Amino acid sequence: MKLSEISDNPGARKKRMRIGRGIGSGKGKTGGRGGKGQTARSGVRIKGFEGGQMPLHRRLPKRGFNNIFRLEFAEINLDRLQDAIDAKTIDAGAVINAESLVAAGVLRRSRDGVRLLGRGELKAKLTIEVHGATKSAIEAVEKAGGSVKILAPKKDEGEAA
């Protein structure tokens, strides 16, 4: 047996069907697309068209608005912080802020700031600087002997006072 003699088992690889190559091919003329018209054409589909019936996006009323001042915080729970400290990803002695969390890979990005949530237990004494925190999170950090400093949201930092 040589490398040049190795081949697939018969029927292991099926030949692809070439469409539009004559009636005798079994997939000629219309090529499996039915008759002529819009549906026979390439990629033509009217989005949301329901055959003349009033489409859903026009049947339902408009609702709400997009607040351009909305702030979106990246959220982190105490148990995630404790896991990162246990794994030595974060130094418990240093100040923990948005930049250090992103640099350590605990958060992917900090968006408009970081908000600390109170799920889980915290054993380490931490100094945390975040843009928002729940009461339970602040209590848990202070109970462990640490402190939480609330910063102004990132969007406000760039504005003139």
Curated annotation (Swiss-Prot):
The keyword Metal-binding does not apply. The keyword Ribosomal protein applies. The lineage of its organism: Bacteria, Pseudomonadati, Pseudomonadota, Alphaproteobacteria, Hyphomicrobiales. SUPFAM superfamilies: Ribosomal proteins L15p and L18e. HAMAP family: Ribosomal_uL15 (MF_01341). Belongs to the universal ribosomal protein uL15 family. GO terms for cellular component: cytosolic large ribosomal subunit. GO terms for molecular function: rRNA binding; structural constituent of ribosome. Residues 21-37 have a biased composition (Gly residues). Pfam families: Ribosomal_L27A. Keywords: Ribonucleoprotein, Ribosomal protein, RNA-binding, rRNA-binding. InterPro entries: Ribosomal_uL15, Ribosomal_uL15/eL18, Ribosomal_uL15/eL18_sf, Ribosomal_uL15_bac-type, Ribosomal_uL15_CS. It comes from the Bacteria. Binds to the 23S rRNA. This is Large ribosomal subunit protein uL15. NCBIfam families: rplO_bact. GO terms for biological process: translation. Residues 1-43 are annotated as: Disordered. Part of the 50S ribosomal subunit.
